[in-house]
């Protein structure tokens, strides 16, 4: 029997993280915003948690077409130790060509992140980017110059509250 694929393990990790958070997650906040083409760098940012403890900022540049309606959903665990940020186009696939993207967190360190070229819509499933197309650091998910193929429709980030130094 062949070993499970990388996609299988990604799904297992995401499911485990989601189950861990689902046990005690506050109602997420979802905010619509426009992704605007034109090649200019734009940013959209939202805060969540007690005292706006966490911030998720989506910075991008894209080309083609007209504005697209996207959404950013933010949620925290009841103990405010975990944070989720999901950025996506609810209609599924984006028709814009992204020249760059970066989702950056403040107040938390990333435990899991995935980028998708196509978001689930109706009977279609999410289509993840190839791992070489994006990179994940402790606080950001971003395109990998030269490898990113300009398709983005969704970002999912699960993070844990950053430890404060005593």
From Swiss-Prot:
Which Pfam families is this protein grouped with? UPF0556 (PF10572)
Question: Can you name a GO cellular component term?
Answer: endoplasmic reticulum-Golgi intermediate compartment
Q: What is this protein called?
A: Myeloid-derived growth factor
> Which Gene Ontology BP terms does the record give?
angiogenesis; apoptotic process; negative regulation of apoptotic process; positive regulation of angiogenesis; positive regulation of endothelial cell proliferation; positive regulation of MAPK cascade; positive regulation of phosphatidylinositol 3-kinase/protein kinase B signal transduction; positive regulation of protein phosphorylation
What tissues has this protein been observed in?
A: Expressed in prostate, spleen and lung, and weakly expressed in the left ventricle (LF) and liver. Expressed predominantly in inflammatory cells, such as monocytes and macrophages, and weakly expressed in neutrophils, T-cells, B-cells, endothelial cells and cardiac myocytes, after myocardial infarction (MI) (at protein level).
Q: Where in the cell is it found?
A: Secreted; Endoplasmic reticulum-Golgi intermediate compartment; Endoplasmic reticulum; Golgi apparatus
Please explain the role this protein plays, according to its UniProt record.
Answer: Bone marrow-derived monocyte and paracrine-acting protein that promotes cardiac myocyte survival and adaptive angiogenesis for cardiac protection and/or repair after myocardial infarction (MI). Stimulates endothelial cell proliferation through a MAPK1/3-, STAT3- and CCND1-mediated signaling pathway. Inhibits cardiac myocyte apoptosis in a PI3K/AKT-dependent signaling pathway.
- Indicate the transmembrane segments per the record: none
Q: What is its main location?
A: secreted
Gene knockout outcome: Mice show normal postnatal body mass gain, develop normally and are fertile. Show larger infarct collagen-rich scars and more severe heart contractile dysfunction compared to wild-type mice after ischemia and reperfusion (IR) injury.
Q: Give the family, as the similarity comment puts it.
A: Belongs to the MYDGF family.
Q: Which UniProt keywords apply?
A: Angiogenesis, Apoptosis, Endoplasmic reticulum, Golgi apparatus, Secreted, Signal
Q: What is the lineage of its organism?
A: Eukaryota, Metazoa, Chordata, Craniata, Vertebrata
Induction entry: Up-regulated by ischemia/hypoxia and reperfusion (IR) injury in the left ventricle (at protein level). Up-regulated during adipocyte differentiation (at protein level).
- Whichever gene encodes this chain, its name is Mydgf
Signal peptide range equals 1-24
Protein species of origin: Mus musculus
* InterPro entries xrefs: MYDGF
């Amino acid at each position: 029997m062949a070993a499970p694929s990388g996609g299988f393990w990604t799904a297992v990790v995401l499911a485990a993280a989601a189950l861990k958070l689902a046990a005690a997650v506050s109602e997420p906040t979802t905010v619509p915003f426009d992704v605007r083409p034109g090649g200019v760098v734009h940013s959209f940012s939202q805060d969540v948690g007690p005292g706006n403890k966490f911030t998720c900022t989506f910075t991008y540049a894209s080309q083609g077409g007209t504005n697209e309606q996207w959404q950013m959903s933010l949620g925290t665990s009841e103990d405010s130790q975990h944070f989720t940020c999901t950025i996506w186009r609810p209609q599924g696939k984006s028709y814009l060509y992204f020249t760059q993207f970066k989702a950056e967190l403040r107040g938390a360190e990333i435990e899991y992140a995935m980028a998708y070229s196509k978001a689930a819509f109706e009977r279609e499933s999410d289509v993840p980017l190839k791992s070489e197309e994006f990179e994940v650091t402790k606080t950001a998910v971003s395109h990998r110059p030269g490898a990113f193929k300009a398709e983005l429709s969704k970002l999912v980030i699960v993070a844990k509250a950053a430890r404060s130094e005593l």
